[in-house]
């Protein structure tokens, strides 16, 4: 959704999903710190791809946290539907956002080059 309304919907859904994850999800598998970086809602409002950054001790903890989010998708969808007034509530699809990890890796490479 590239138009102004689409951007507003993306931002509103991002804000609400972030709040729901922070305050209402009580899954014990969700041990990683979760940050919702971006949301892309399709034009027909059927799907919302939610990109999350997971800060965890190891990869196993990240995987468990992502599984917990995916299993909570129905609850999150219902809560978003109650908070955001849309024609239809989009189905929530979680994707891991590795952009922060990639940026840190590139920065470490640049620091190594700088040292040489």
Swiss-Prot record:
MF GO annotations: ribosomal small subunit binding
Annotated protein name in UniProt: Ribosome-binding factor A
One of the GO BP terms on file: maturation of SSU-rRNA
GO CC list: cytosol
Source species taxonomy: Bacteria, Bacillati, Bacillota, Clostridia, Eubacteriales
Chain's role: One of several proteins that assist in the late maturation steps of the functional core of the 30S ribosomal subunit. Associates with free 30S ribosomal subunits (but not with 30S subunits that are part of 70S ribosomes or polysomes). Required for efficient processing of 16S rRNA. May interact with the 5'-terminal helix region of 16S rRNA.
Assigned protein family: Belongs to the RbfA family.
Location(s) in or outside the cell: Cytoplasm
HAMAP family membership: RbfA (MF_00003)
Record-annotated disulphide pairs: none
InterPro entries: KH_dom-like_a/b, RbfA, RbfA_dom_sf, Ribosome-bd_factorA_CS
UniProt KW keywords: Cytoplasm, Ribosome biogenesis
Assembly with partners or alone: Monomer. Binds 30S ribosomal subunits, but not 50S ribosomal subunits or 70S ribosomes.
């Amino acid at each position: 959704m590239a138009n102004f309304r689409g951007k507003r919907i993306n931002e509103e859904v991002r804000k609400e999903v972030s709040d729901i994850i922070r305050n209402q999800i009580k899954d014990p598998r969700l041990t990683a710190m979760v940050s919702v970086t971006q949301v892309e809602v399709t034009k027909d409002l059927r799907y919302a791809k939610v990109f999350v950054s997971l800060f965890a001790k190891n990869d196993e903890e990240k995987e468990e946290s992502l599984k917990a989010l995916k299993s909570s998708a129905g609850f999150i969808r219902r809560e978003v539907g109650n908070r955001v007034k849309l024609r239809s509530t989009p189905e929530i699809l979680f994707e891991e956002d590795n952009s922060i990890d990639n940026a840190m890796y590139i920065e470490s490479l640049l620091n190594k080059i700088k040292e040489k």
